[in-house]
């Protein structure tokens, strides 16, 4: 392997964690503009292909040595209900901005270990998402 090439790319880089990425964030975003943009993008995506959801479930009982995710290591499963209730409240905020029923094409569960959550709690979450 070329040592120069290795040294060139052996540097820390930011992880892709959000869109838009952090350098494009600013404090002057107007709520009305954001809501209008959300509605427009939602309608375009929903009519064309449906929407994809990413639900961040950050809990794990143990740490994987390779993990770079935003996670919380715990064996206390009492956090499940509180966290899922918060996700459902947030979903309802977004849902109130949608003028039509979302066509959900895919759901990605990630962050920590989705299997940290009981099957019953995951079912409650998915029912709340799909009942809208």
What do the predicted segments below correspond to?
Residues 22, 70-72, 110-112:
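Short strand-loop junctions, especially beta-strand C-caps/beta-turns
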Residues 1-51:
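Flexible, acidic/Gly-rich N-terminal and inter-domain linker regions that tether
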Residues 87-97:
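A short, N-terminal amphipathic alpha-helix
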Residues 38-49, 77, 96-103, 131-132:
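Short, glycine- and charge-enriched coil/turn segments that flank and shape catalytic ligand pockets
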Residues 81-88, 119, 123:
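Non-membrane alpha-helical structural segments and their capping/turn regions in soluble enzymes
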Residues 60, 87, 109:
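Conserved, mostly hydrophobic/aromatic
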Residues 98-132:
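Conserved glycine-rich "GG(E/T)P / GGGxP" loop and the immediately following alpha-helix
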Residues 50-83:
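Canonical Radical SAM [4Fe-4S] cluster-binding loop centered on the CxxxCxxC motif
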């Amino acid at each position: 392997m070329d040592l120069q090439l290795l040294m060139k790319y052996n540097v820390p880089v930011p992880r892709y964690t959000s869109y838009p990425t952090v350098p494009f964030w600013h404090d002057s975003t107007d709520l009305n503009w954001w809501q209008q943009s959300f509605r427009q993008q939602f309608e375009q995506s929903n009519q064309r292909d449906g929407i994809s959801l990413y639900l961040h479930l950050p809990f794990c009982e143990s740490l994987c040595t390779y993990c770079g995710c935003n996670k919380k290591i715990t064996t206390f499963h009492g956090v499940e209900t509180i966290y899922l209730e918060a996700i459902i409240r947030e979903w309802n905020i977004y849902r109130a901005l949608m003028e039509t029923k979302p066509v959900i094409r895919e759901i990605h569960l990630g962050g920590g270990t989705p299997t940290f959550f009981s099957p019953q709690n995951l079912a409650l979450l998915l029912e709340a998402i799909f009942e809208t």
